[in-house]
Amino acid sequence: MSQLNSVWVFSDNPERYAELFGGAQQWGQQVYAIVQNTDQAQAVMPYGPKCLYVLAQNDALQRTENYAESIAALLKDKHPAMLLLAATKRGKALAARLSVQLNAALVNDATAVDIVDGHICAEHRMYGGLAFAQEKINSPLAIITLAPGVQEPCTSDTSHQCPTETVPYVAPRHEILCRERRAKAASSVDLSKAKRVVGVGRGLAAQDDLKMVHELAAVLNAEVGCSRPIAEGENWMERERYIGVSGVLLKSDLYLTLGISGQIQHMVGGNGAKVIVAINKDKNAPIFNYADYGLVGDIYKVVPALISQLSR
């Protein structure tokens, strides 16, 4: 695989920079990073950028999308071949604005990127995860938002130093204003980084029964995830634990599913696990088509037995 001269990265979520650098270092000879403040600059420095660009006029109420004009002005001057962003809600909103202002091709939620004969090729899901599309980008600049868990994080070198420059703030014609912030209870779990995950679906009859699921997860030293109906229909678990096409994409060593039917929208998120073990009382459940190991049984009988055996 050939490499581009330079790849630029930006993320509104600082935790995603390691993954972005992991991809950028693979696809580009040199990596440049855009960050929102000096604290992020210090955190990103060990990943090995050629230069760091710090966005000016940042404060707690500033919205990421308002930096589109500032970043666009910078990129017009530097002429990179690729801008890589984290595929967050705000990252994709910013990417859309930059695509218009720079007349650049945009691929959202990319699951793979390759450089073939100097051309950038990106893969992404379509039709709700039922298929993958391969896009060959012909514009001088490619803007790509990278799905979480796709790229291995890069290693860090705390001794690395590079120049830091400030990017002047160019106010957009219409700013998005944040008038107030309210605290939101959220899970600190990041399933995309978990080594073992226990997933629960509609086979669970009541919210109180999550207790046995967490007990099993504790024995396995695993995190707990769920299908979309559990998170957004029943509201039994946090949105951060939803596994699926518009949720978390797993890259775990083990994914143990309990009462999950295995619809394609869910398996888009679960299929990245190295080993899938399925427990479902319906022998015709689609999940068994994906599972490396399957057990036809009632989770209310199987899970307590597993906890008992694994606790010995």
Swiss-Prot record:
May play a role in a redox process. YdiR and YdiQ form a heterodimer. SUPFAM superfamilies: Adenine nucleotide alpha hydrolases-like, DHS-like NAD/FAD-binding domain. Keywords: Electron transport, FAD, Flavoprotein, Transport. NCBIfam families: PRK11916.1. FAD binds at residues 254-282. This is Putative electron transfer flavoprotein subunit YdiR. It comes from Escherichia coli (strain K12). One of its GO terms (biological process) is fatty acid beta-oxidation using acyl-CoA dehydrogenase. GO terms for molecular function: electron transfer activity; flavin adenine dinucleotide binding. InterPro entries: DHS-like_NAD/FAD-binding_dom (IPR029035), ETF_a/b_N (IPR014730), ETF_a/FixB (IPR001308), ETF_asu_C (IPR014731), ETF_asu_C_CS (IPR018206), Rossmann-like_a/b/a_fold (IPR014729). The lineage of its organism: Bacteria, Pseudomonadati, Pseudomonadota, Gammaproteobacteria, Enterobacterales. Pfam families: ETF, ETF_alpha. The keyword Repeat does not apply. The gene is ydiR. Signal peptide: none annotated.
